Amino acid sequence: MDVRRRSEKPAYPTKEFAAGEKPLKPHKQQQEQDNSLLIASDALPLPLYLTNGLFFTMFFSVMYYLLSRWREKIRNSTPLHVVTFSELVAIASLIASVIYLLGFFGIGFVQSFVSRDNNDECWDEEDENDEQFLLEEDSRRGPATTLGCTAVPPPPALQIVPMVPPQPSKVAAMSEKPAPLVTPAASEEDEEIIKSVVQGKMPSYSLESKLGDCKRAASIRKEALQRITGKSLEGLPLEGFDYESILGQCCEMPIGYVQIPVGIAGPLLLDGREYSVPMATTEGCLVASTNRGCKAIYASGGATSVLLRDGMTRAPCVRFGTAKRAAELKFFVEDPVKFETLAAVFNQSSRFARLQRIQCAIAGKNLYMRFVCSTGDAMGMNMVSKGVQNVLDYLQNEYPDMDVIGISGNFCSDKKPAAVNWIEGRGKSVVCEAIITEEVVKKVLKTEVAALVELNMLKNLTGSAMAGALGGFNAHASNIVSAVYIATGQDPAQNIESSHCITMMEAVNDGKDLHVSVTMPSIEVGTVGGGTQLASQSACLNLLGVKGANREVPGSNARLLATIVAGSVLAGELSLMSAISAGQLVKSHMKYNRSTKDVTKASS
């Protein structure tokens, strides 16, 4: 089959084609006529510098004349709508000059963009139609009379060569950019959008709203990012995720998702019930170690937990002119009668929010009010913030000189290690304990009770005190908290205060058995809202039996999840401390937490 070689596309569309080239098809003839755009200056025979100067002079002189007349009328108390003939002429001249200037500069400016976009679209349409024309022409034996064109033989100098797929340029090969991540059916349209994003014509954040397809928007954004940075994102998966589920609530401008393996530790026997604990982590040996701790707890009869407090906090900062006025508001807020009024205002924000107390602190003329409230099965940051805003609006009427500096004054304290959380608690305060028998300590944990007690005192208590730890009197509570948080859709940043933990170990029953406990004053979890509604995280919550909100006892699912977190931390602490006590830490990590391939490379 003979295939014609298409001549190279000129830099800009032209009105005529050189002799020997293929004739224009009817739709291209109309397209060439449309490309002959008029500009505003074509209607005037005078040189542009004369007409421009004339109308610029007319505009400014007439404007000055009208403003002067306007000022005189104001001084003489003359009605502005009474105009003379000269003023009518001036107004007409002003309108004429404005029309000319807008027509010349405004239309020309717009046409410069419109014509450029139209030309680009014309060339894209021409490329597509040319390829289709060549394929249709090759499939016919007779001349192409059905297209309304006269068959013109190719020029003698034009060689007949087979068409081959375009090869990637050397620059593209060096940058190792993958092919555009678009579907064949929409490749041309998506390619134009990708170019617009790369060139900065279309904001990347607006793709979802303009396309109406979240997955397609993520695909286009990912390809545009590869072209902008020159870095390959081939290993970042795009398929297999519901991007509609994160729109407007979990993540902005997505380009894919990160895969984190999820392991199962357990069964964890806690308060008479068994739980298989999902842990999302990339640290080898972590799940295995926690699983061993669960085994030791199970073999010893299980663990028990107690919920001490349940209240999310938010602490706005307000300022007064004097410290005395700040103290007056402090006394007002702490008054039991006034508190009932503030609680009623606060509780209007949600049917689950219930204000429990307000803790105040003064720094000069600044007052920090730490609101504590229950939030049902939600983690509750948005809920408590909304309630605090209602109270601030109410107090603004009572204290008009109160200046609200910010709805969060860091006396909360969120996503930061703070003594106020360690002492007063934030979220769920839980203590979890278990008695591990001597037999289990020796057979499962491979250590001795006395060795564990001594190590805990010197490491978790004395060592942490020497380091000036704030809530870090434990071995690795953060490891377990982070893994469970990621698996169940919690806020990973709140791992900071949620990992506040003190681990205690004592010998009981005449020194034969081990009493171990973890006290965690600020576990911040929820079973509704945020990442808990995503498919994978929702499945992990369902595995624990705490998916969604509990309709019968609001808040019970979130409280149960907090106790499961504490029980998992107890298992992790027990296993790691045993490994350190028995001298097995390095051996186990070299076996489970380090690649054999990496060890070989390091030794060679």
Curated annotation (Swiss-Prot):
Enzyme class: oxidoreductase
Xref: Pfam families: HMG-CoA_red (PF00368)
Residue positions with a glycan: N347, N460, N593
Pathway(s) where this gene product acts: Metabolic intermediate biosynthesis; (R)-mevalonate biosynthesis; (R)-mevalonate from acetyl-CoA: step 3/3
Stimuli inducing this protein: In leaves, by wounding, elicitation, bacterial or fungal infection.
Chain intervals for the UniProt region annotation (Catalytic): 190-604
GO molecular function, one term: hydroxymethylglutaryl-CoA reductase (NADPH) activity
Active site: E283 (charge relay system), K415 (charge relay system), D491 (charge relay system), H589 (proton donor)
Membrane-crossing segments per the record: 40-62, 90-110
Xref: InterPro entries: HMG_CoA_Rdtase, HMG_CoA_Rdtase_cat_sf, HMG_CoA_Rdtase_CS, HMG_CoA_Rdtase_eu_arc, HMG_CoA_Rdtase_N, HMG_CoA_Rdtase_NAD(P)-bd_sf, HMG_CoA_Rdtase_sub-bd_dom_sf
One term under GO cellular component: endoplasmic reticulum membrane
Expression sites by tissue: Found in protoplasts and leaves submitted to stress. Low levels found in apexes, anthers and roots.
SUPFAM superfamilies in UniProt: NAD-binding domain of HMG-CoA reductase (SSF55035), Substrate-binding domain of HMG-CoA reductase (SSF56542)
Biological process terms in GO annotation: coenzyme A metabolic process; isoprenoid biosynthetic process; sterol biosynthetic process
Chief site of localization: endoplasmic reticulum
Region of interest: Disordered: 1-31
Assigned keywords, A-Z: Endoplasmic reticulum, Glycoprotein, Isoprene biosynthesis, Membrane, NADP, Oxidoreductase, Transmembrane, Transmembrane helix
Protein's cellular compartments: Endoplasmic reticulum membrane
Catalytic reaction annotation: (R)-mevalonate + 2 NADP(+) + CoA = (3S)-3-hydroxy-3-methylglutaryl-CoA + 2 NADPH + 2 H(+)
Region (Linker): 111-189
EC number: 1.1.1.34
Membrane-protein topology: Multi-pass membrane protein
Family named by the database record: Belongs to the HMG-CoA reductase family.
Free-text function comment from the UniProt entry: Catalyzes the synthesis of mevalonate, the specific precursor of all isoprenoid compounds present in plants. Possible role in plant defense mechanisms as well as in the cell cycle.
The name this protein goes by in its record: 3-hydroxy-3-methylglutaryl-coenzyme A reductase
